[in-house]
Amino acid sequence: VRSRAVYTNNIPCGAMRGFGVNQINFAVESCVDELCEMGGFDRWQIRYDNALTPGGMTSTGQVLQSGIGIRKTLEAVKDVFQQSRHAGIACGIKNTGIGNGVPDTGKVKIVIESPERILIHQGWTEMGQGVYTMAVQFFCEVTGLSPEIVEVRVDTAEESESGMTTASRGTSIIGHSVIDAATKLKQDLEQSSLEELTGKVYQGEWTCDWTTALESDSDNIQ
């Protein structure tokens, strides 16, 4: 992997996916493929045999519990991969959130401006990672309303706390906050129409406060 750093006078921007991790992963997976070729191993099988599973421990000491779907994912693509002449395969597991015992909070505000216009105020900077799309999908999934009437707006003046735009936190932190606010709207929609709810504001909030602090002596790092 070769890289070049350039010092410029441009205004710095936030990170957009990975801080270089994607490039390193590409190189590591390529090395795994080369080792398989040299040793006569099956590229799919070596990844399956070494995949993390519930009860396993990561390199940082976290004992995994649920939601580990690497093997199921590999099983789902096995036939397609092995039948394709030109196909690559790679595996990865992604955490979300800052961790280290730091409470991580997200807040949103949903405003019913009219029956044809609903605003979702949130503080997450959209740089192509799909935060706006995710917020609309969560909102519509909960309420059953059309995405055509929903607009997502980033506005820190609206006190929509989000923290840093880092660590792939958008889907979990903002997503849960949208669910919280949208659930309240859904309850009102069972009794009232959007026209009757025009002008109403719904606050949503979600906090991840269960991660392990750096100085903690724990057998299971979260």
Question: What are these language model-derived features?
Answer:
Residues 143-147:
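Phosphate-handling active-site elements
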Residues 12-24, 167:
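A short glycine-threonine-serine/GTX helix/turn-capping micro-motif
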Residues 7-16, 56-58:
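Gly-rich Lys/Arg/Thr-decorated short loops/hinges at beta-loop-alpha junctions or inter-strand turns
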